[in-house]
């Protein structure tokens, strides 16, 4: 049969109450905030004929600026995860989530995760939402160097931005901008972010685009909640270490091209942990492909 172990984290002992920051080779299984059991990775390999690691790629990229230690700064994944968990567990009655109600929110990052932060902040009751994007604003229609059937590099206004436009009357995104410093009040709480405009220039030798700060373009954005959605750096390393699986240069679990088997016998991987942060449709595809590979490993063939 197949057994799904959800919410799995690495813990360093039975009494560990915060497995998300622990290290070691003990596995702690959690379901809806309830501790189920502790078991070593080696024990799982002894008990099961195959183990599929599908732990995501949630290691967030941080920002290295003065004032980063201020209160009121969260990674996007923590903000979104606590919101969803509190909603499902208690419809927010437990209060175990980061709330944007009444806050001026600054979202750092213009991708899908940043969009989710914008939409969630608005639904929680934020009084202002600003989203920073380092890249230039894309055109609304295809450029001459982006013909069909290439993927259209055009401006996309997702649900979060659409809700912001409907509520505040303007697009929350500010392009070609980054944070230089975070300002704290006397209590150590974030109260503003000092930003600077960016310019992108093409290197004549390499052809690569490089960004540089525009002199005298600094300005300040008032905010009391900052959500960092600056991308992800691959999977959490402690899971891979527990099973002894190798990571590639992108810190995703390494496999042969088009395969899901790791360097460890009986251990497979799929989803974001395998290919890096992506959309749920890819996670579904990866899960199906990994299941077929495991089926073939166990039975010698697969019926799809």
Task: Give residue spans per PLM region.
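A conserved FAD-binding loop/helix module that cradles the flavin
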Residues: 115-117, 273-298
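Cofactor-binding loop segments of dinucleotide-utilizing enzymes, especially the Rossmann-like FAD-
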Residues: 110, 133-137, 184, 272
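General small-molecule cofactor/ligand-binding pocket signal
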Residues: 3-5, 74, 174, 268
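Rossmann-like dinucleotide-binding cores of NAD(P)H-dependent redox enzymes
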Residues: 1, 118-181, 301-304
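Feature captures the FAD/FMN-dependent oxidoreductase FAD-binding
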Residues: 1-65, 180-194, 199-202, 225, ...
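Rossmann-like NAD(P)H-binding beta-loop-alpha module
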Residues: 89-126
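FAD-site-proximal beta/loop scaffold in flavoenzymes
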Residues: 71-102, 201-277
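Phosphate-coordination loops involved in phosphoryl transfer and adenosine-cofactor binding
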Residues: 7, 101-104, 176, 264
């Amino acid at each position: 049969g197949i057994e799904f172990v959800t919410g799995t984290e690495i813990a360093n002992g039975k009494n560990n109450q915060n497995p998300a920051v622990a290290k070691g080779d003990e596995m702690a299984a959690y379901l809806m905030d309830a501790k189920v059991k502790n078991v070593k990775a080696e024990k799982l390999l002894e008990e099961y004929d195959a183990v599929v690691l599908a732990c995501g790629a949630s290691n967030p990229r941080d920002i290295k600026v003065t004032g980063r230690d201020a209160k009121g700064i969260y990674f996007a994944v923590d903000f979104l995860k606590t919101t969803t968990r509190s909603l499902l567990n208690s419809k927010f009655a437990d209060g175990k989530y980061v709330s944007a109600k009444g806050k001026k929110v600054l979202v750092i990052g213009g991708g899908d995760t940043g969009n989710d932060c914008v939409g969630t902040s608005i639904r929680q009751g934020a009084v202002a939402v600003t989203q920073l994007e380092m890249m230039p604003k894309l055109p609304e229609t295809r450029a001459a160097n982006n013909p069909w059937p290439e993927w259209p590099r055009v401006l996309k206004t997702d649900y979060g931005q659409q809700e912001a436009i409907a509520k505040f009357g303007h697009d929350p995104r500010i392009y070609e901008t980054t944070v230089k410093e975070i300002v704290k009040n006397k209590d150590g709480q974030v109260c503003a972010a000092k930003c600077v405009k960016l310019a992108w220039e093409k290197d004549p030798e390499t052809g690569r685009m490089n960004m540089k700060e525009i002199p005298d373009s600094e300005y300040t954005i008032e905010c009391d909640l900052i959500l960092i959605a600056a991308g992800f750096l691959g999977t959490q390393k402690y899971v891979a270490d527990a099973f002894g699986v190798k990571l590639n240069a992108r810190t995703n679990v390494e496999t042969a091209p088009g395969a899901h088997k790791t360097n460890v016998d009986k251990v497979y991987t799929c989803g974001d942990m395998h290919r890096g942060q992506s959309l749920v449709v890819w996670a579904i595809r990866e899960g199906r492909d990994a299941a077929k590979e495991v089926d073939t490993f166990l039975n010698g063939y697969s019926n799809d």
